[in-house]
């Protein structure tokens, strides 16, 4: 499980972000946002951890680590609206996820 989560995190490019839930979904474990946190904690800082945020683009890390995350994201060109990342502009969507969403939209539009 952690290998798939770490692989999904590595795919997030500079200037893009994803929520813990997005990463869990992309790794094939919908609803496993907490496991994404555990995978990040056990990574030894080798992953682009700053690109993973709380729901709605909120930095959840307190104090200095939260400030560091914001600084790193801003240095990658990520824009903030108040305390949150502009998710409309910077949210990363894995190609497979987009395909699944298109299929879901087609199914729901027929009804």
Per-range role (PLM):
Residues 1-111:
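Nucleic acid-binding interface residues in structured DNA/RNA-binding domains
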């Amino acid at each position: 499980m952690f290998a798939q989560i770490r692989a999904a995190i590595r795919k997030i490019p500079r200037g893009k972000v994803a929520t813990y839930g997005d990463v869990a979904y992309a790794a094939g474990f919908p609803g496993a946002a907490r496991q994404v946190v555990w995978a990040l904690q056990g990574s030894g800082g080798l992953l682009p951890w700053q690109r993973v945020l709380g729901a709605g683009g909120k930095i959840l890390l307190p104090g200095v680590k939260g400030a560091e995350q914001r600084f790193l994201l801003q240095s990658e060109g990520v824009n903030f609206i108040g305390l949150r990342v502009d998710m409309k502009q910077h949210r990363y969507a894995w190609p497979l996820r987009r395909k699944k969403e298109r299929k879901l939209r087609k199914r729901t539009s027929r009804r």
